[in-house]
Amino acid sequence: MRKHSVDLNSDMGEGFGPWKIGDGVDEEIMPLISSANIATGFHAGDPNIIARTVQLAKNAGVGVGAHPGFRDLVGFGRRDIGETPQALVNDIVYQLGALREFARFHGVSVQHVKPHGALYMRAARDEALSRLLVETLQQLDPALRLYCMEASVTYRIARELGQPVVREFYADRDYGRNGSIVFTRRAGRLDPRQVADKVLRACVDGRVATVDGEDIDIDFDSICLHSDTPGALALARATRDALTAHGIRIAAPATAEANGIRIDEA
């Protein structure tokens, strides 16, 4: 199942005022990726940061995507905030609307949506939330690509309702037997070479090792590298270098499709 083309995405613009999450290396990471998930103000991001990040993406030729989260600035969107369905719909519309206007102002379009943190993980296992999310996107723009894991309720609902979907592989996260990511405590930074080898194996062989030491099949359209992972820049460089050295093209889904490469056949 060797891949000839793959997307490389990262969360960008995750700060607020003078505050930054991670190493603050958005400018260095942006040219290495093909899709940027831009924080839209509720877990991180403010008007100045959003504008700057959209411009960075435009300058680098990187696809712009919205990265909406729960209304949880203090907890960085990692807390499951109890909201009514209508309030959550309004929050998502608000965040996407903000990014789309900044994108329009800078002469680019929003190509995808990737929920952040607790919203992403809760939707992955919650059918009602996934359906609400997908139906909201369909009303806003049925062509928006939704990023999610294949081993998730979100993926199933998106396919059922006909929303374009981009399946993710997490380079800097561990996997469980069911193909979903698990969160484990690590001492120190990830080794860039090991991360690059993990990505290459997934791209070439379609396999990934789980935290239990077993191998499972994995398929995906996009590789996610978190910009707030310690040493994120080194991980991004090693991953990109490994992919290009093995002849695997890095391209956003819209670019791949424009060149006749279907995402599910890349």
Swiss-Prot record:
Reaction(s) catalysed (UniProt annotation): 5-oxo-L-proline + ATP + 2 H2O = L-glutamate + ADP + phosphate + H(+)
SUPFAM superfamilies per UniProt: Glycoside hydrolase/deacetylase (SSF88713)
GO biological process terms, semicolon-separated: carbohydrate metabolic process
GO MF annotations, alphabetized: 5-oxoprolinase (ATP-hydrolyzing) activity; ATP binding
CDD domains registered for this protein in UniProt: LamB_YcsF_like_2
Membrane-spanning ranges: none
EC number: 3.5.2.9
Signal peptide: none
Keywords associated with the record: ATP-binding, Hydrolase, Nucleotide-binding
HAMAP family noted in UniProt: PxpA
Subunit annotation: Forms a complex composed of PxpA, PxpB and PxpC.
Family label: Belongs to the LamB/PxpA family.
Function: Catalyzes the cleavage of 5-oxoproline to form L-glutamate coupled to the hydrolysis of ATP to ADP and inorganic phosphate.
Annotated protein name in UniProt: 5-oxoprolinase subunit A 2
